[in-house]
């Protein structure tokens, strides 16, 4: 598949490439990850100034109306540069949930600060026993006045240590697996009775275990419609993550090819060995297949096609397996230095591994694809 970008989309891509080339090389990224905060406010502000944070949102809420295709363009470049700032968590996930399900008052209250880069958000939906099931929620919510009071625990909440606000899934009614009982709530990350234990993920980002001991939150959207909102949001998040993975895979192929032209063994460059040439061809094919599937998914997201969830699961599984294959081979072809901190190859491997388990690993999505296909 070969997407023909519009003039505006080409301008967006070249602007992102120029910004990251000037401000986000590998050494700069290593310093950001090693810092106490783990991300750069300066870069986040630069993303806002360039309009990247506004790009996916509709013009009605102050965005640029670029939709999922602008997200795809941005995330591919972010993947090539291993950007750690929480674009998916804040813009693609939280921002879209607010835009699609929030009241007009909530949109006016929250979206301008998100688009301006003033506030960071995170989605707290995973629990220790939930695996990847959006409806498997034990955190509870009961009404108290105009607000709700939330009690429970959330696990591995990406970007939570950076966040100003959280969107939390909690059960207001029904049993543990009841889809209709789950709702979404906006919670101030610094609210009373909210305890957060931060940790560093394998790819250098930050996440947290969250304990809610009677925390006040406001309902986002309609009560009992949280799972449906999360399912739609998950498809868009998968589109963004697949674009990031494809960008990372392309960069891995490029650096591995260049390395094979300079690294000498047995008196010649390793790229002259036919068996390694065949392996790099396999890597190239895997990337091209993943690229086409990712583009197809994001075009479908833009058109809101039928069968979207099935396509998202198919893409997540196929691209996940392709990414792991390319990352494995890149490390092997670089030898022992492939996993050193000084070389970007190992960092790409870690990021692709992390993407693979966000919103469901490849094995989960193979099963989900089969279930959706059978039900079609």
What positions do the PLM features span?
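A short, Trp-centered hydrophobic/proline-enriched beta-strand micro-motif
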Residues: 117-128
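Short Gly/Pro-enriched turn/cap motifs at secondary-structure boundaries
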Residues: 87, 129-132, 156-158, 176, ...
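Short beta-strand-to-turn element immediately C-terminal to the catalytic PLP-Schiff-base lysine
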Residues: 100-102, 142, 168-171, 186-188, ...
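N-terminal glycine-rich flavin-associated loop
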Residues: 85-105
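Flexible, small-/acidic-enriched active-site or ligand-binding loops
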Residues: 136-138, 156, 188-222
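Alpha-helical interface subdomain recognition
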Residues: 1-82, 101-105, 113, 117-118, ...
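Cytochrome P450 C-terminal beta-domain/meander region
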Residues: 133-151
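A short core secondary-structure module
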Residues: 151-194
